[in-house]
């Protein structure tokens, strides 16, 4: 028996898409306008974020590649046989082609089936690895491969009204996760127990809010003591002690869309040294919230906030940029690097953008007030300023948790 290279699996009915049909039509139209302006015949996306953004399909790689082929007329997802009909059910597009494991590089055969020929093809330079780029080029020897990743990132940076609704729900659910952290927190309770409680609360809130939603990737980083020194440090078995500096980080993931709540906490009491540093970081946070508005330049915001840290002689303990964009992203895909509040980013804020304000300083072990301090709010930039959609309280008046 000759096993096929590709299949079409139409199993079940199409599911309800995350956004309206018009929303996806608008996204695909903007993409096609860019392709036409640059004389690009088709785009072959390979990243989680762009495939999700343009088709509502968020793949699970597990070592296999995926793609979305967009031409003037078609939007075709390319998925692995192991996923069955799920990619077809989710894809907002014209087709889904499944590649099998039976022959080497059937993935590229599926892409070529979706796009038999082209003179100029858009790819993602920041995602497609060298090996697969070479294999793709071999399939289209007469085609020029050009980057579309940067242009697509700029499209994603301006959020639609429907995306704003999604992000508002995410911010609300992140606050639910934060409340669950406080609920589970106690002396000698391990980090993982607190994190599990918060993640469960957020997953249930997502399920209560959305129909036909895929529940994947929601997580909590709850860090204590020395583990607060890195914003992305994993949850451990360390047990919380009274007087510990704590970092609450809740991340509800909804259809590939990221939101976050991050707060500094203390259990029972806070030393004078810790309190002083915490208040400095809150001062910067509050100043930053006022700077988010249309017309503000990312680099200027960063430099102005640096002056406050410098005034308190703690600028040397700052750890990363002051904020970043939101949308279809996670800890393993989708960073919109053109919209970050850093000294090396000169992007000007516009209505529709969604950014965080999240200053952090970290003092290493052995120094008075050692630990990592971070507050994180989400703001939607509008015509007149910005709306803070994070409601969870911050600062020493609210977040010294006494039980």
UniProtKB/Swiss-Prot annotation:
The active site is at 232. Homodimer. InterPro entries: Creatin/AminoP/Spt16_N, Creatinase/aminopeptidase-like, Creatinase_C, Creatinase_N, Pept_M24, Peptidase_M24B. Disulfide bonds: none annotated. Belongs to the peptidase M24 family. Creatinase subfamily. Gene3D superfamilies: Creatinase/methionine aminopeptidase superfamily (3.90.230.10), Creatinase/prolidase N-terminal domain (3.40.350.10). One of its GO terms (molecular function) is creatinase activity. Keywords: Hydrolase. It comes from Pseudomonas putida. The keyword Hydrolase applies. Its EC number is 3.5.3.3. The keyword GTP-binding does not apply. It comes from the Bacteria. It catalyses: creatine + H2O = sarcosine + urea. This is Creatinase. PANTHER family: AMINOPEPTIDASE (PTHR46112), XAA-PRO AMINOPEPTIDASE P-RELATED (PTHR46112:SF2). Each monomer has two clearly defined domains. The small N-terminal domain (AA 1-161) and the large domain (AA 162-403). Each of the two active sites is made by residues of the large domain of one monomer and some residues of the small domain of the other monomer. Pfam families: Creatinase_N, Peptidase_M24.
């Amino acid at each position: 028996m000759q096993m096929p290279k590709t299949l079409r699996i139409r199993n079940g009915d199409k599911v309800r898409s995350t956004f309206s049909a018009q929303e996806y039509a608008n996204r695909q139209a903007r993409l096609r306008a860019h392709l036409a302006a640059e004389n690009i015949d088709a785009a072959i996306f390979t990243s989680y974020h762009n495939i999700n953004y343009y088709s509502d399909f968020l793949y699970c790689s597990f070592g296999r590649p995926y793609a979305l082929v967009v031409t003037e007329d078609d939007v075709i997802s390319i998925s692995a046989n192991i996923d069955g009909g799920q990619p077809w059910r989710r894809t907002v597009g014209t087709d889904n082609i499944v590649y099998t494991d039976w022959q080497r590089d059937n993935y590229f055969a599926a892409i070529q089936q979706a796009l038999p020929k082209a003179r100029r093809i858009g790819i993602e330079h920041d995602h497609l690895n060298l090996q697969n780029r070479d294999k793709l080029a071999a399939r289209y020897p007469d085609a020029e491969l050009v980057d579309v990743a940067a242009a697509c990132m700029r499209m994603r940076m301006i959020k639609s009204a429907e995306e704003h609704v999604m992000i508002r729900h995410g911010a609300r659910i992140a606050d639910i996760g934060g409340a669950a952290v406080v609920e589970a927190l106690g002396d000698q309770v391990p980090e993982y127990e607190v994190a599990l409680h918060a993640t469960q609360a957020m997953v249930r809130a997502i399920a209560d809010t959305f129909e036909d939603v895929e529940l994947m990737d929601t997580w909590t980083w709850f860090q204590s003591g020395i583990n607060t020194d890195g914003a992305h440090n994993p949850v451990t078995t360390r047990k919380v002690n009274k007087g510990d500096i704590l970092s609450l980080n809740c991340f509800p993931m909804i259809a590939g869309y990221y939101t976050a709540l991050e707060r500094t906490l203390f259990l029972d009491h806070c030393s004078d040294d810790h309190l002083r540093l915490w208040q400095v970081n809150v001062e910067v946070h509050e100043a930053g919230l006022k700077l988010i508005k249309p017309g503000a330049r990312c680099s200027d915001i960063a430099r102005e906030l640096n002056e406050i840290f410098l005034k308190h002689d703690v600028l040397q303990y700052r750890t990363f940029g002051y904020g970043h964009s939101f949308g279809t992203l996670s800890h393993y895909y989708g960073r919109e690097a053109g919209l970050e509040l850093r000294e090396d980013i000169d992007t000007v804020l516009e209505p529709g953008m969604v950014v965080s304000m999240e200053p952090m300083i970290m003092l290493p072990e052995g120094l008075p007030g050692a630990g990592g301090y971070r507050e994180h709010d989400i703001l939607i930039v509008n015509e007149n300023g910005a709306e803070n959609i994070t409601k969870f309280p911050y600062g020493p008046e609210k977040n010294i948790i006494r039980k």
